[in-house]
From Swiss-Prot:
The record marks H227 as: Plays an important role in substrate specificity. This is Serine hydroxymethyltransferase. Its main location: cytoplasm. The keyword Transferase applies. Its EC number is 2.1.2.1. (6S)-5,6,7,8-tetrahydrofolate binds at L119, G123, H124, L125, E243. Pfam families: SHMT. It is found in: Cytoplasm. Disulfide bonds: none annotated. The lineage of its organism: Bacteria, Bacillati, Bacillota, Clostridia, Eubacteriales. Pathway: One-carbon metabolism; tetrahydrofolate interconversion; Amino-acid biosynthesis; glycine biosynthesis; glycine from L-serine: step 1/1.
Length: 413
């Protein structure tokens, strides 16, 4: 009874997976944190390595029979170090959030002060939000962006750091469209003798390709997810200087996790191998080109963007004054098969479940093959959908335009 294919043994679940496959094929995916992995990454993650328990690290396991999963993890580690020029890599975190928690667990004590980017200004829950463990266990001070520019003011950040003297400065964001100057923040951290921790989850692919300043030379510890712009499986990773390697490894196992997910680690190794190839840089450059083309198209059609544009893979659209909330925009776009997410903008008057903005990203559409001219067409569809929402013919017309683009660039054909 346990040897059949999923369609035979569990047709209800098989149908849900097939429907999701169809949704991914027919929708234009603009969620900035999502991407489509390669068939090789899918193959590795769906492999028999899912059967193997392997507590510990390569060569130092608490279980027998780990000689081959050791090869997979060692490949992931060596490739990650090469990709980012890091002294040490831990590829076992199950997620970016767990990687971040392990950093705090390794370097801080409850009640220590951290300085992180305000979630409402584009930061992340795990950088000190009061609803997250990082905001409950630590004394959190926040920095943000300027209301008129939508950008980080590094001099103000320095003033806060000098006044508050945090034990750790956290950099990185989940909804910030401009390049972050890690060198400058690292200098501020050195000035006050604080740890400098960077979460580069959103921009890791751009960093790997040399298209965004790398935090690795300046930070004590760097975390990332392995999906998003890196185009690997959903998971996390920690990079650090050699002096923190033992602390970080112990914070993951046995500190906060048990057995690593060896099938996911194998998929990470496959993705890192792909990222080391020359064509990966061209792919990352196209992500940026597409984001800037989408930004240009939206600006030309009357939309306001936080900070006025983008340097990376994402755009934050300010919908104030349009009569549409972020929640409404997300729903309207979903109805025409464009997937995005409502997102708070800096100094947002709306509640977090309503918001005044939407976040758009280009990694997934770039994987499909979209180019700049296609992104202008996407901007046209977004404008049509949101600006002519009361026209009864809008939905049908927009869906047809989406279908034409998706048929042009089939997914997993």
């Amino acid at each position: 009874m346990f040897n059949g294919k999923l369609a035979q043994t569990d047709p209800e679940l098989a149908k849900a997976i097939e429907l999701e496959h169809q949704r991914q094929q027919r929708n234009i995916e603009l969620i900035a944190s999502e991407n489509f992995v390669s068939p090789a990454v899918l193959e590795a993650q769906g492999s028999i390595l899912t059967n193997k328990y392997a507590e510990g690290y390569p060569g130092k396991r608490y279980y027998g029979g780990c000689e081959f999963v050791d090869i997979a993890e060692s490949l992931a580690i060596s490739r990650a170090k090469k990709l980012f020029g890091a002294d040490h890599a831990n590829v076992q975190p199950h997620s970016g959030a767990q990687a971040n928690f392990a950093v705090y667990f390794a370097l801080l004590q409850p009640g220590d002060k951290i300085l992180g980017m305000n979630l409402a200004h584009g930061g992340h829950l795990t950088h000190g939000s009061p609803v997250n463990v990082s905001g409950k266990y630590f004394n959190v001070v926040a920095y943000g962006v300027e209301e008129d520019t939508g950008c980080i003011n590094y001099e103000k950040l320095r003033e806060i750091a000098l006044q508050e003297k945090p034990k750790m400065i956290v950099a990185g964001a989940s909804a910030y469209a401009r390049a972050i100057d890690f060198k400058k923040i690292g200098e501020i951290a050195k000035e006050i003798d604080a740890y400098f921790f960077v979460d580069m989850a959103h921009i890791a692919g751009l960093v790997a390709a040399g298209l965004h300043q790398s935090p690795v030379p300046y930070a004590d510890v760097v975390t990332t997810t392995t999906h998003k712009t890196l185009r690997g499986p959903r998971g996390g990773m920690i990079l650090c200087k050699e002096e923190y390697a033992q602390l970080i490894d112990k914070a993951i196992f046995p500190g906060s996790q048990g057995g690593p997910l060896m099938h996911v680690i194998a998929a990470k190794a496959a993705a890192f191998g792909e990222a080391l190839k020359p064509e990966f840089k061209a792919y990352q450059q196209q992500i940026i080109n597409n984001a800037q083309a989408l930004a240009k198209g939206l600006l030309e059609r009357g939309f306001n963007l936080v900070s006025g544009g983008t340097d990376n893979h994402l755009i934050l659209v300010d919908l104030r004054g349009t009569g549409i909330t972020g929640k409404q925009a997300e729903t309207l776009l979903d109805e025409v098969h464009i997937t995005c997410n409502k997102n708070a903008i800096p100094f947002d008057p709306e509640k977090p479940f309503v918001t005044s903005g939407i976040r758009l990203g280009t990694p997934a559409v770039t994987t499909r093959g979209f180019k700049e001219k296609d992104m202008d067409k996407v901007a046209e569809i977004i404008a049509l959908t949101l600006q002519e929402k009361d026209n009864p013919d809008t939905q049908e017309k927009a869906r047809a335009m989406v279908k034409e683009l998706c048929d042009k660039y089939p997914l997993y054909a």
